[in-house]
């Protein structure tokens, strides 16, 4: 009753799983990237304003 999968079938299933995971989580990664970019810009602006005050 136990049927084994061949190596190509296992590799295909693994690749499909990885690709599916990347597709599902891509919006989360993009949002994180945008948030980090905005945060860096805010920090840069704050540092520039502090340098002007000094």
UniProtKB/Swiss-Prot annotation:
Transmembrane domains' residue ranges: 10-29
Mitochondrial intermembrane topological domain: 1-9
Region of interest (Required for interaction with CLCC1), ranges: 30-36
Gene Ontology biological-process entries: regulation of endoplasmic reticulum unfolded protein response; response to unfolded protein
Membrane topology (Cytoplasmic): 30-54
Keyword field: Membrane, Mitochondrion, Mitochondrion outer membrane, Transmembrane, Transmembrane helix, Unfolded protein response
Tissue specificity field: Detected in a number of tested tissues including pancreas, brain, heart, kidney, liver, thymus and white adipose tissue (at protein level).
Protein purpose: Plays a role in regulation of the unfolded protein response triggered by endoplasmic reticulum (ER) stress resulting from the presence of unfolded proteins in the ER lumen.
Subunit relationships: Homooligomer. Interacts (via C-terminus) with endoplasmic reticulum (ER) protein CLCC1; the interaction occurs at the mitochondria-associated ER membrane, a zone of contact between the ER and mitochondrial membranes, but does not appear to play a role in ER-mitochondria tethering and is not affected by ER stress.
Protein name per its UniProtKB record: Protein PIGBOS1
Organism: Rattus norvegicus (Rat)
Lineage: Eukaryota, Metazoa, Chordata, Craniata, Vertebrata
Gene designation: Pigbos1
